[in-house]
Amino acid sequence: MTFSVDKVRADFPVLSREVNGLPLAYLDSAASAQKPSQVIDSEAEFYRHGYAAVHRGIHTLSAQATEKMENVRKRASLFINARSAEELVFVRGTTEGINLVANSWGNSNVRAGDNIIISQMEHHANIVPWQMLCARVGAELRVIPLNPDGTLQLETLPTLFDEKTRLLAITHVSNVLGTENPLAEMITLAHQHGAKVLVDGAQAVMHHPVHVQALDCDFYVFSGHKLYGPTGIGILYVKEALLQEMPPWEGGGSMIATVSLSEGTTWTKAPWRFEAGTPNTGGIIGLGAALEYVSALGLNSIAEYEQNLMHYALSQLESVPDLTLYGPQNRLGVIAFNLGKHHAYDVGSFLDNYGIAVRTGHHCAMPLMAYYNVPAMCRASLAMYNTHEEVDRLVTGLQRIHRLLG
């Protein structure tokens, strides 16, 4: 199937609107992607004509809603090439997925004197849960340092592992730098030391195919809203044998086998024992539509288009005076930058006046900001619906801001 950005854009209603009297150039998909009509319509249709509580209902609407929900689990397992749909837990998003692992697997397997390895480029969602776990149990948090070019100092990684290392928690793609980490060699090294590996895939799954079996990671987590799906829904993948050993994190309905006031409670099997309470069924339906939409376009075709657009953007940005780019030349999805000595908020505000939406701030990556000794950065992210013309508008806008602010 030939990729057509014009056809893709026609599926996204918001891209036809104007901001400040100018066509919207939405360059903030790394924060949250826009939604195609297919996703919006699927969720609306469910609420209009198919809504019911899932599980245990004997009536038609409940049975159909349950079947739709479980079909999305199957579709998601195929999307990331898992061995079984029962290795996937529905979560609110990447943050909840990581916290689930920290509070279930982590509380059961990490002890005083143990250590966990993360990197200096992590999103706070892959830092704070491990800090909290280490504080609870008396474990140590070790950090893979950054290089100035935005890659990790991988030569230090073997020195961080020892017999007390329980987990490597690493991002697949940096949400600030666009760096894609060499997961295969990192996962192999971790397993050689008996450690498990969690991969934060929030910034990866929309840009190219992911094969969790080939990666051999123990945990992989991502959000739906960055993948053109709804907010409030995501996927946590856990190897089946590992998942069946993990205790539940939250208690309530749907995750039990039996409840007795005198004899206590027993749990249902995984993955359902990690899905306490009424699920976000509408969000799950929308996620399924997003997976179907992206799969129909073809992730390889999307990757080819986006990489060509990224190369064009990096080339054109070289013409902007006093522009500092952060991250490696080979990157996925995002371009972080600062313009001269001007604060990122000021630059972002000017760009918004030109109808261009970028993200400004620390991007939930304060340790990374500290490494580069800046309080904030601007970040333009490129998605499958962005165009060369929008890149040109970004470049022209930055050139104009430089002239205005000096």
UniProtKB/Swiss-Prot annotation:
| Biochemical pathway | Cofactor biosynthesis; iron-sulfur cluster biosynthesis
Please give one Pfam family short name. Aminotran_5
Claim: Membrane is one of the keywords in the record: no
- Its Enzyme Commission number? 2.8.1.7, 4.4.1.16
The record ties this protein, via CDD domains, to: SufS_like (cd06453)
Task: Give me the Gene Ontology terms describing cellular component.
Answer: cytoplasm
Modified residue N6-(pyridoxal phosphate)lysine is at which positions? Answer: K226
**Quick check: keyword Zinc in the entry?**
no
Task: Provide the protein's localization.
Answer: Cytoplasm
Q: What cofactor does this chain's UniProt record say it requires?
A: pyridoxal 5'-phosphate
| Protein name, UniProt field | Cysteine desulfurase
| Organism from which the protein derives | Escherichia coli O139:H28 (strain E24377A / ETEC)
